[in-house]
Amino acid sequence: IIAHVDHGKTTLVDEMLKQSCIYRENQTVVDRVMDSGDLERERGITILAKNTAVHYKGTKINIVDTPGHADFGGEVERILKMVNGVILLVDAAEGPMPQTRFVLQKALELGHKVIVVINKIDRLDARIEEVMDEILELLLDLNATEEQFDSPTLFCSARQGVASYGPTEPGVNLDPLFKTIVDYIPAPTGDPEAPLQMLVSSIDYNDYVGRIGIGRIERGTIRQNQEVSICDYHDPEHSAKGKVVALYEFDGLGKKPITEASAGEIVAFSGMADITIGRTVCAPELPEPLPFVKISDPTIEMTFSVNDSPFAGREGKYVTSRNLRDRLNRELLKDVSLHVTEQGTDAFNVAGRGEMHLSILIETMRREGYELQVSPPHVLTHEENGKVMEPMERVVIDVPEIYQGNVM
């Protein structure tokens, strides 16, 4: 689901989950259930891409909720590789926004089919006709194919949980949306009989089972206790053997254990300590790595160190450098765009994608009871042969002709 911050993406997923009956009758339902982290709920943003699955009249629909913020952009590009189509969700008053453009462009380049959903049609300042024109202009700008240009359009209010085929038709529930997804978005093509091939698109970590790899099976079938090869497209020399100890499928809000899954399914598996994003899990007799988007390098760095101020030890439970080191190493297991290097005995250089990326890590650690001091962030420079290279930026600005003069 592609949407700008606050256009109602996570709320829409909530309603899809409710209406596909994944909750028990007496279960308490929180709003924005996909934003499961405390910080995500407070800031109203999605930080990590999450997967879920709903069933509609016998068809299983895998839904992936992605972050809209550029600091977490590494998440978006990887996730697009896991899907067959996208829902472009646009606010009926604000229209398409810059972040929508970035993700939509990536989706169109991959040839994904698009379903346009205009959300918040019950807003008093909704301008549905104009927003529809803006979306068509955006698709034109991004060189959409004829088929992508003729995408079906639905009108909905995610908060009320209704969708309809026309802006004036009264909606009853989200059935029109489910029906369009099932009819319009193609089912995954993959031969379940072929040798296994699956790209790991995201990782999770659990204290009991260690690293958990998540990905979509491109072809073949994966089974519990199966012996597999792990290879890497950008590092052809890397090849390791592993065993699938446990296998899970996404069902509603949780994972449930299964014994096998075939092409097209999105699954999670554990049992391989060195599994990481971008590696391909293959059948040992045919190790063929799949290409993937390299994760962007960090842009800023901060120093995390032990609190040595006069007020040390008053707030946190974990105050030593060993506590800090263990916590940062644990974060590295699930966040691939973070880099940590040790500086002396009790300081660590932590580099990330942007200020928001690092501020969320600091705030999470503070809430967990860690006490630390941090330096101001500084921009990372790139050195070649001992010389600091100056960044060269090539900027392409797409603007309608009427603004050309102002921008130049």
In which residue ranges do the predicted regions lie?
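Conserved Switch II/interswitch segment of TRAFAC-class P-loop GTPases
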Residues: 61, 66-72, 80-104, 108-130
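Short glycine/threonine-rich beta-strand-turn micro-motifs
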Residues: 157, 343-357
